[in-house]
């Protein structure tokens, strides 16, 4: 998935509009997640109708007010608006966890539009973490099924279930349990003891002591 955004910039839809401008930052936000590419324009009546539904869909899957842990889902908004002001008005009421392609990067926005054959809006492309397409337009699916359709995408994507990890957007080290070192030491001790026991039994066998037989 990172290849799609290689050498590109994505922006967080937060107050400061923080930029993800390194491959590592983008990879950490998108890897092992179902990716939604949302193509829309603020002046479209159909987009205006669908946007609140998509917002609710996304929030119910990622906001811990509704779920114990955020689903492995990311959304990148690709604006087809006529101006940056229109884009900003559209995104103003959308979730802060959304990402978007900078309006000034028109070439990249147009390339995505062509790559996914976007001829009308709204369009919601669903991608596996690998970048392979699950659906070229899941708008109707989201409208009809709501959040349950994410489970289908998740199964098709074969993403790793990280429900056992600490909160999302942490690096691999932060995702490890605090008890990992203890468990590793314990496992090592147990393995050492097993070797000692096996050696002791082998010594008894050699000496005719009839030690325990291992299979």
Curated annotation (Swiss-Prot):
One of its GO terms (cellular component) is mitochondrion. Residues 185-215 are annotated as: Disordered. InterPro entries: RdCVF (IPR029520), Thioredoxin-like_fold (IPR012336), Thioredoxin-like_sf (IPR036249). One of its GO terms (biological process) is photoreceptor cell maintenance. Keywords: Cell projection. Residues 1-165 form the Thioredoxin domain. Pfam families: Thioredoxin_8. Residues 185-194 have a biased composition (Basic and acidic residues). It is found in: Cell projection, Cilium, Photoreceptor outer segment. Belongs to the nucleoredoxin family. This is Nucleoredoxin-like protein 1. It comes from Xenopus laevis. The lineage of its organism: Eukaryota, Metazoa, Chordata, Craniata, Vertebrata. The gene is nxnl1.
């Amino acid at each position: 998935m990172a290849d799609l955004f290689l050498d590109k910039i994505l922006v967080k839809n937060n107050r400061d509009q923080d930029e993800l401008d390194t491959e590592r930052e983008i990879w950490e936000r998108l890897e092992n997640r179902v990716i939604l590419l949302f193509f829309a324009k603020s002046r479209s009546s159909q987009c205006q109708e669908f946007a609140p539904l998509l917002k609710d869909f996304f929030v119910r899957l990622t906001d811990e007010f509704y779920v114990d842990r955020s689903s492995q889902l990311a959304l990148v908004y690709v604006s087809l608006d006529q101006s940056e002001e229109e884009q900003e008005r559209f995104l103003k009421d959308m979730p802060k966890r959304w990402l978007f392609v900078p309006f000034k990067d028109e070439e990249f926005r147009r390339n995505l539009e062509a790559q996914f054959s976007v001829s009308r809006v709204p369009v919601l492309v669903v991608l596996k973490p690998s970048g392979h397409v699950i659906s070229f337009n899941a708008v109707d699916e989201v409208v009809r099924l709501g959040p349950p359709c994410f489970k289908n995408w998740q199964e098709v994507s074969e993403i790793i279930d990280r429900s056992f990890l600490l909160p999302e957007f942490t690096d691999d080290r932060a995702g490890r349990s605090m008890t990992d070192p203890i468990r590793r030491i314990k496992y090592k001790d147990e393995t050492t003891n097993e070797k000692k026991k096996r050696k002791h039994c082998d010594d008894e066998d050699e000496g005719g002591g009839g030690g325990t037989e291992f299979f």
